[in-house]
Amino acid sequence: TGAPEEGVKGQSLFIVPKYVVDDSGRLGERNDVVVAGLNHKMGYRGTTNTVLSFGEGRYRPAGQAGALGEIIGREGHGLAYMFHMMNEARIAVGAGAVALGYTGYLRSVAYARTRTQGRPLGNKQPDHPPVPIIRHPDVRRMLLTQKACVEGGLALVLYASRLVDERQTAPTEEERSAAALLLDVLTPIVKAWPAQWCLHANDLAIQVHGAYGYTRDYPVEQLYRDNRLNPIHEGTNG
């Protein structure tokens, strides 16, 4: 809705139901909105993602062409409503990125403690038994890098989550206002930083597993595929 020259100020938010609902709340005739196809994704394969088609003429609700939708809130405020939802969703994206990164880190530590390969650094005895790869300095470097990324991301997410509560529940108006202002600054950081660096941690988790990390015998490849979405959705990283 709105004039074209209004730009984003002219955008409104609508809900378009599958079935038209009458004033009594009963489901009526079929609305002209259909699933046009499935998106075949790199990750998150346990969730369905679709392409929707509106008003293509397959159904004619109320005998007229086009899909019927109900406006949500005030006309021309659709983008503002979307950002109200997305800002807290961005914190959830950061939390999801941390969870996937942390899982990969823990898997890496467990694997590095049991996988044996090579001799200790500086040992030249050919008959020395192989040692767990966690004893190799470069493997430790990769593990510590993962730990720094995921624990830093976790601290950031927990701090932002506390600010969400304080924005509403702090005892004074001054404290509530300060929490809200700080959250405005931190929200894009909480989304973008864990999304980038916890994905890097997942990449290192694959590297620690070696060739096995590239197979589906171990879950680290799935963790990377699932986490790859987080730098993209709810506000794309640069």
Question: What is the predicted function of each stretch?
Answer:
Residues 1-238:
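Internal glycine-rich alpha/beta core junctions
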